[in-house]
From Swiss-Prot:
Catalytic reaction annotation: Endohydrolysis of (1->4)-beta-D-glucosidic linkages in cellulose, lichenin and cereal beta-D-glucans
Protein name: Manganese dependent endoglucanase Eg5A
Role description: Secreted manganese dependent endoglucanase that acts by cleaving the beta-1,4-glucose linkage. Exhibits high activity toward carboxymethyl-cellulose (CMC), barley glucan, and glucomannan. Displays low activity on larminarin and xyloglucan but does not hydrolyze hemicellulose substrates such as birchwood xylan, arabinoxylan, and arabinan.
Family label: Belongs to the glycosyl hydrolase 5 (cellulase A) family.
GN (gene name): Eg5A
Record has Signal as a keyword: yes
SMART domains in alphabetical order: fCBD
Source organism, top-level taxon: Eukaryota
Length: 386
């Protein structure tokens, strides 16, 4: 497992430039300002990142700050893994051929025994409703629900994200922009809300990785319609609101975020409307390479600033990951340490991926046949579970 050296920040002399609230003020390799403007405290969040957090005076800290009090109704700190399989063969244009593969249910108890408390279970729209806008397939729902229940039963505090994994599309057409109508999109969520609305540990992942959306404002209206439909069905679950550009955490503050923060909850308040973001660590942010080139801390810092400035909202990093390589073991550990330290603004993470992926998959965290874990899980994920 990775070992971190402790960081001690020295008091800077007067006259040195000061960092603004929420700006970086220290960390391994940091060469900028190490004092904060009046009213902020330079606090160590992890060995690579210290931040100017509003406080009583400008001081430095050699240990992480106490965890902020979560707002009423906030999600608890979460950490876990995507258990893929029912999404296999969904293309990025929303087309699908296949039957899906059931994730091994033994993985849930395996990971939960180590502290995981979040499982994201993706599925193809076409498997759940073979006819667009039609009724849910009871045979598939029974199969899918067995997986959901196995995850929930693996621990009393485990949450499950049911993830519609279709890229805001059905067979090439974008929702409300030449493809499925808003009513057809709402139909599947109405039915899923009727199924899972009684269990508050089921989080509704409204859509995986919308991308190349001609009108983001139209897409946000579609998201609002899904929220309204879920609430009209009587469900009070937490909802994950997806942005654009493949749910990019980097694009969120300037692209979809300013519109998504205006989505309202018929229940009142915003504590159950959580933003859904993704960020990989390879050279092109695609999650297709075994090596990592960034820990995304600066990207996530900007996201945190945006969320705190817009109503102290929460987000989940529901996809991130890397290969079982030394670069990813180090950089993913840094990223997840920051996510954990940024609670409650960042509610948690789920790494990609286990489930029906075999151990040769480039981003696998699927346990080996002998029950041992992948190096990435041992060195980067497990130390940062809740």
């Amino acid at each position: 497992m990775l070992k971190y050296a402790s960081i001690a920040l020295a008091l800077a002399t007067l006259g040195v430039a000061q960092q603004q609230q929420w700006g970086q003020c220290g960390g391994i390799g940091w060469t900028g300002a190490t004092t904060c403007v009046a009213g902020s405290v330079c606090s160590v969040l992890n060995p690579y990142y210290s931040q100017c957090i509003p406080g009583a005076a400008t001081v430095t800290s050699s240990s992480a700050p106490s965890t902020p009090t979560p707002p009423a109704g906030a999600l608890p700190r979460l950490g876990g893994v995507n258990t893929a399989g029912y999404d296999f063969s969904v293309a990025t244009d929303g087309s699908f051929t296949g039957t899906g593969v059931s994730p091994p249910v033994s993985q849930f108890s395996h990971f939960s025994s180590q502290g995981a408390n979040l499982y994201r279970i993706p599925f193809a729209w076409q498997l759940m409703t073979p006819t667009l806008g039609g009724t849910i397939s009871q045979s598939f729902l029974s199969r899918y629900d067995q997986t959901v229940q196995a995850a929930l039963n693996s621990g009393p505090n485990v949450f499950v994200i049911i993830d519609l994994h279709n890229y805001a599309r059905w067979n090439g057409g974008i929702i409300a922009q030449g493809g499925p109508t808003d009513a057809q999109f709402q139909s599947i969520w109405t039915q899923l809300a009727q199924k899972y609305g009684s269990n508050q540990r089921v989080i509704f992942g409204i859509m995986n990785e919308p991308h190349d959306i001609p009108s983001i404002s139209t897409w946000v209206n579609s998201v609002q319609g899904a929220v309204n439909a879920i609430r009209a069905a009587g469900a009070t679950n937490y909802l994950l609101l997806p942005g654009s550009s493949w749910s990019s955490a980097q694009a969120f503050p300037t692209e979809a975020g300013p519109l998504l923060v205006k989505v309202t909850d018929p229940l009142g308040g915003t504590s159950k409307l959580i933003f859904d973001v993704h960020k990989y660590l390879d050279s092109d942010n695609s999650g297709t390479h075994p090596d990592c080139t960034t820990d995304n801390v600066q990207v996530l810092q900007t996201l945190v600033q945006f969320l705190q400035a817009n109503g102290n909202r929460q987000a989940i990093l529901s996809e991130t990951g890397g290969g079982n390589t030394s670069s990813c073991e180090s950089l993913l550990a840094n990223e997840l340490a920051y996510v954990k330290s940024a609670y409650p603004t960042l509610a948690g993470f789920s790494v990609w991926a286990a489930g029906a992926f075999d151990t040769t998959y480039v981003l696998t965290v699927t346990p080996n046949a002998d029950g041992s874990d992948q190096p990435l899980w041992v060195d980067a994920v497990k130390p940062n579970l809740p």
